[in-house]
Structures are given as structure tokens and as C-alpha cells.
């Protein structure tokens, strides 16, 4: 089986081979090395990410294992409480989602009954979800005529004599709980269908949930330490045997991985006496170092590991940065060379444990030299980029694309007196993330040729992006940028599905769309009803000039980095949900998707196989390569 996987990896440059490889990854984790000997753990969830970073056909497959793990994600963002908006109808009043809908109803009724309003003003009322407690309050204020009566009881003729009583329809709604509707007109009332929505857009639009990007960038420097974890092969899979740091200590233990990690954590705690946060800098650490340690992470050690962050029980944080994500695809030695430090070779990962033990002294020496080189290169790069991209700091970002684009957006917006804002709360962040669709939409299963947008950067740099804080609107304004919660109805006739939905049997569903995606969907024949939106009154003008200025500055500093960065930005604009410019990514991806759809409009739908926001698969039998298709490159 190992031989089969090794052959597949060497030829993994086409869709069919990669899909076969995925089948193996459902059962095993592939242990591989790059040319410099750095270990790489390949599993089903990260193979796409690895392929976007490197040519996997050049990796050496060392073995297969089930004794390893994926990165441990941060605790999931709690799902926002489902929301029902207020409905004030001539026949009834349904309050918006609330812990105390009965209190909302009595306050609503006070708008029509002055004596209730006066009592509320003079005495107030405590929150309660009990009808009997509300009725007790009404009676104590001489307002028993407005007592609350359940609809079912009223229909039993028990309260006919109370003509002014407050009749409420009581119900329990899944994921919300008790809800009440005030029935204003018994003659015309029928229980309404109320949309239960995933977001409360009015809440999300609150000013305090949004902060200007520039205010979060100018942070003081935090202590930086280069680190590398080395793994050896055993019969039970790979184990970490050495953790090296610079400046700092090297920890080696062949007998107990637990003690190896605990000694490292004790050292970390000792050096954090004067700071609550430190930065560990590795190279390809997300592909090997962190997942390898995660497998063996001790319970009750006082630290939790989530993805690239260590959090102690007393709140201290260690952020593990991956310098590879700022290297634009360079090898470790090339990265060190291009940023002015002496390139040094590093110890090979995934060697036999016996070999590692026998050569431990030389491996420690080799590791320290390599880490010193990495540390010096990173310090040089971070210092240079933080001058050019001020006020951005490298440790505030997880990859160079985010840092570069944030710098450009900040500079352009500051020059125009407007700023881009980002959410400081999980719920608005989740709302923005929900408007992103990176999935492929399948149209027809057929043998196809793959096309990609020639330059994503050209498309997104000529568009406009939201500036300032958003406002809540019931329906978005044509010509303005907004993100809306939408009820989408699929066209009844044959159509190309342009709005992703994971249930083919549903013709109506609720989802989050940008104003750009809404326009695209309407062009494709979809019916869209907006259920509330975040709308921006101001736009950041096009970014093209700002991009060109920033590119020139970085090119003068380091041509190799600039050329590789440009290549990455031209081919990809991948959404990063932890980025402070997630709002930019949301609209950038929508603009790309609109561009893809404009090309699909020129092609007979029978030839379209599938598409994403940047790629289009067209039947191999399609020969009419028109002018629109010339804006894409065949892969």
C-alpha cells in the first residue's frame, strides 16, 4: 500500500489521481518530507491547503499512519440564537425574540392605553415570563381589566366578560422557547407563519460591535522565539523527540514525550514573567510541529493547545507563527538567504528513533544553527515589512497576503478620510463568514477542462469595498454595498445554480448574500426576498493605485518576495475567517463569482460542468472559445 501511495504522490498533478489519493487519506495520514527534510503530515482536511502551498509531487513519502491527529481547532463559535423579528399587524402583534415576550407585549399595549403607560412610568415592572405574575401586577395597579388571557382559555367562554383583556396566543418554538402573540382582532386573527432566522441583523449593526481597522494594528512588540519540533519514526507512528528554541534551550527526551512537552512548557512559563503573550516562530509548523505535539499533549498540564495558540490556565497566551506563510513559497534556506541570514541545513524529520538517539548531539547542534538563521531572517523581514506596511505588525496576521492587503486597504482608506471597520464580536463575524461560498457548484457531471481566472488581483483591485460602520436596513438600496439575510427561491425552469445550497430537494431556503451576489442571482432567475441587511453608505475607492505603490515599495526591498507574492495574489484570494479584513474578502470573492457567471452566460449550459468563485470546468467537447473565455487560463 505504501508503494501505491508513493506512486500516486509522484503523479498527483491531475484531478483523478488526487481523488484516488483522497480515498487513502480517509483511512491514513501520510508521513512525508520536503527536500530540506522537514516533516509534513498530510490528511484529508489539509491536502488542498498543502497543494496550494507547494508541489506535492516533489515530496518524499516516508510512511502511512493512523497514530496522528489533525490540528485541534479552537472551541467553535456558539451558534447565534435563532431570531424572530417583530411583526405589528392590524390583527396581532408578535414581539421579536426575547426572554420576556409578555413584557414586550405589555409595553406595546401601553402605546395605546395611557393608564398602562402611566403605571409603567411610575412603578416599572420586573421582567417575568409568568402570566400570573403580570396579572398580579396589573391588579395591584388597578388595571385588572387588561389582564392576560390565553387564547385557548378565552375560547372556552371563561373570560368573555373582560372585553379589554389582553388575549395572547401561546406557543413553544424550537431553539427559541416560549413565545406569545397578542391578538388584537379575534375576528381576523389566524396564527401567522413567522420566519425563524439565524441572525438578528439589527443587533449585528450596533456601533460597539465594529471597530476601525487602524486602531487594532499599532501594537507594541512582543517577545519572539524561533522554535522547531523534530519527530522520529517508531512502530506506533511518529513521535516528537526534540524541541529546539532560539534564543533559548533545546529539549531532548527519547523515553517520555510527556516529560519532553512538560519541560518545554515549564521553560515557556518561566520566560513569561514580564509579558502575557509571546510569539513562537516556526517554519511549516502548521504542517508538522503543532499537529505532532497535539497528538501527545498531556492532560491537566495547565495549557490547552488550539490550532496555533497555546493558552494557559491563568490566561497567558503563546502564538505559534508559521514564517513559511510569509515566505511566498520559499524553502527555509532560500527564505533565510533572501532575508540576509546565513542559510543552514536542519535535521531531517521522520528518521528512525534509533538513528536520532545515536546522533542526538550533532542533531542538537544542527538544529540550533538552523534556528538561529531562521530567527535572524524573521527579525529582518518583520522589521522591514512593518516599516513598509505600517501600522501592520507581522504577529497580527497569519499570512503575508492578509498583511499586505490590510496595509493597502488601510492606506487607501486613510488617504480618503474613511476607514474599513471589522466586527469585534463572534456573531457579526459569523454573519460575514456565512456570506462566503468557496464550494464548487456542480452543474453536470462530464469530462471537463479546467479554467481559472487569469488575474484575480486585476478583478478585485478595480472594485469598491465598504467603508465606515454599517447601518441596519430592512432592504438594501440599489447601488450601495450591503450584506443581507435572504429568502431565496430557486427558478422553476432549467437554470445554472449560482447560489450554493446543500439540499437539492429544497426550492426555498434562507442564506446570507452580498449585494453583488444578489445581483448575480437575480440575473440567473432567482427570486430574492431580503429579510434585513447591513448596508454601508460609503465606499473605499478602487485599490489599484494603492496596490501598485505598495508592490513597488516591497519590490525595491526584495524582488523575489514581491514576485512570488504577486503570483499568489493573482491566482488566489482565499478567504481567511480570522482576518480583520474578512469584510474585504467577502466582497472580493463575490466580485470574482460575478465575473465567472458573466463568462458562463456566454456558454451553452450543457457544456458547464462545475464552477467556484475563481474556476470554471467546461466540457472537453466544447470548442467555441470566445472572447470572454480568453480572460481565463486553461490549466
Curated annotation (Swiss-Prot):
Upper taxonomic lineage: Viruses, Varidnaviria, Bamfordvirae, Nucleocytoviricota, Pokkesviricetes
Family: Belongs to the orthopoxvirus OPG056 family.
Originating gene: OPG056
Any GO CC annotation of this UniProt entry: host cell endosome
Subunit structure: Interacts with protein OPG164. Interacts with protein OPG064.
Keyword vocabulary terms for this entry: Early protein, Host endosome, Host-virus interaction, Late protein, Membrane, Microtubular outwards viral transport, Viral release from host cell, Virion, Virulence
Protein name as annotated: Protein OPG056
BP terms from Gene Ontology: microtubule-dependent intracellular transport of viral material towards cell periphery
Keyword Transferase: no
